[in-house]
Amino acid sequence: MKLFLTQSANVGDVKAYLLHEVFRAAAQKANVSIVGTPAEADLVLVFGSVLPNNPDLVGKKVFIIGEAIAMISPEVTLANALANGADYVAPKSAVSFTGVSGVKNIVAVTACPTGVAHTFMSAEAIEAYAKKQGWNVKVETRGQVGAGNEITVEEVAAADLVFVAADIDVPLDKFKGKPMYRTSTGLALKKTEQEFDKAFKEAKIFDGGNNAGTKEESREKKGVYKHLMTGVSHMLPLVVAGGLLIAISFMFSFNVIENTGVFQDLPNMLINIGSGVAFKLMIAVFAGYVAFSIADRPGLAVGLIAGMLASEAGAGILGGIIAGFLAGYVVKGLNVIIRLPASLTSLKPILILPLLGSMIVGLTMIYLINPPVAEIMKELSNWLTSMGEVNAIVLGAIIGAMMCIDMGGPVNKAAYTFSVGLIASQVYTPMAAAMAAGMVPPIGMTVATWIARNKFTVSQCDAGKASFVLGLCFISEGALPFVAADPIRVIISSVIGGAVAGAISMGLNITLQAPHGGLFVIPFVSEPLKYLGAIAIGALSTGVVYAIIKSKNNAE
């Protein structure tokens, strides 16, 4: 008897390696040969709970067993497999909801790069639409504080559809075996009905890999933007913590806290924690999770190492971007190129890929990437810190306009990532401009509802009150209800106001070390009153422009 060992996609590499070793010993005792390919095998033993969708298994006898039970009693499991192997039946890759009637059970997951705005706004949109249809729905949010409203095993089992609206990689292993549809938070928020229509047509059984989704998802979510946003999402807490610690340390310079006794060395300690550790780690974590998004877990270690090399060399965020993509695609390429016997396959992700990847990418970073990129970042930092007032105003206007063009979309995130990345190079003026501009659209919409109340419906006026609060918290997406109703006019007025706020902030050389927080981090701005003035002027510009160009017919 010839036996081939394999496992479900959700079984970890280390566990798979241990199972293979245990069953190799059990097979030797039972005089069963372990072979390296399904084609050679008389029986295929699958560890896990989901059969792999593998055409090589067609025509083979298979036996599937949970990995925990298999590990406890390998001899008994092997005997059962030899006696009870059944013909392989491939799992269906698509699900038809034709004829499904009555109350549907929907579970959903939402996640965005910052884990703040789109995560929760799309969750509300999904929940509202599902309840309107009379469905049972539960939405799990994967924000910066972790999973909220967590979906239970029982709820997964009862679900008719798993609806995933995520702009970054999120763990979905608990949904294996269920019909799943993937989309972005933006589409789930703005086109909820259309996305659910597509979900019921295009959902596929999720087997723990990357099979669930749509053609659109493959184009949009697997590209550069998704990889970058995965890195940004994991980097942000480090930037926030590091920036605020540095800002707090400055309080001692102004005798806000008495700088004596036990506090004497505290400023230097805080700066060391913020700048010496957090800011160095931010580039490594960013690169690590970019690589993780591309090559999964084998890419993480290589990306972290490459990112730390970029950070130590002074290559900044540009070096981190290159390090992350280089590490990810090198590891992904090695994974495809390197072919090993079945007995050694489990060593590839935990030994061979990290070792070869770290060596190749590390040496490439040290000798080819870091020297020129570090020089570029040095010149860029010098230019940004010594630029004239006119250049500063122009750059501020560009950053401000980009922050307001799509409010949480790719252009917005490009400007935001650029500004956040420069914090690691001790350049803080772009971050101040980006945050000021990002606060403008929602506050500007509130101003417009005050100025031209007769042009807005009662519900829009109420939305204006909510958008004001969101704007103060630096949540640009607070303006999205207005964008959905009147996109061209809202975007034009928002871009004008954002450019004004960004230009004023950069022109006044205002700095900010914290990348998020809105009104709550104003005390850590170099010029708080001037900064509030820049935001107010920008919001007023947006509000006045929109109040003028908005059509009365739009409110009907």
Curated annotation (Swiss-Prot):
GO terms for cellular component: plasma membrane. Pfam families: PTS_EIIC, PTS_IIB. It catalyses: D-fructose(out) + N(pros)-phospho-L-histidyl-[protein] = D-fructose 1-phosphate(in) + L-histidyl-[protein]. GO terms for biological process: phosphoenolpyruvate-dependent sugar phosphotransferase system. It is a multi-pass membrane protein. It comes from the Bacteria. Its EC number is 2.7.1.202. The keyword Amino-acid biosynthesis does not apply. Residues 1-85, 106-201 form the PTS EIIB type-2 domain. It is found in: Cell inner membrane. The chain crosses the membrane at residues 237-257, 275-295, 302-322, 324-344, 349-369, 390-410, 431-451, 468-488, 490-510, 529-549. The phosphoenolpyruvate-dependent sugar phosphotransferase system (sugar PTS), a major carbohydrate active transport system, catalyzes the phosphorylation of incoming sugar substrates concomitantly with their translocation across the cell membrane. The enzyme II FruAB PTS system is involved in fructose transport. The PTS EIIB type-2 domain is phosphorylated by phospho-EIIA on a cysteinyl residue. Then, it transfers the phosphoryl group to the sugar substrate concomitantly with the sugar uptake processed by the PTS EIIC type-2 domain. In the N-terminal, the PTS system fructose-specific possesses a duplicated EIIB domain (EIIB' domain) which lacks the active site and functions to facilitate phosphoryl transfer between the EIIA domain of diphosphoryl transfer protein (DTP) and the EIIB domain. The presence of the EIIB' domain is required for normal high affinity recognition of DTP by the PTS system fructose-specific as well as for normal rates of phosphoryl transfer between the EIIA and EIIB domains of DTP and PTS system fructose-specific, respectively. This is PTS system fructose-specific EIIB'BC component. The gene is fruA.
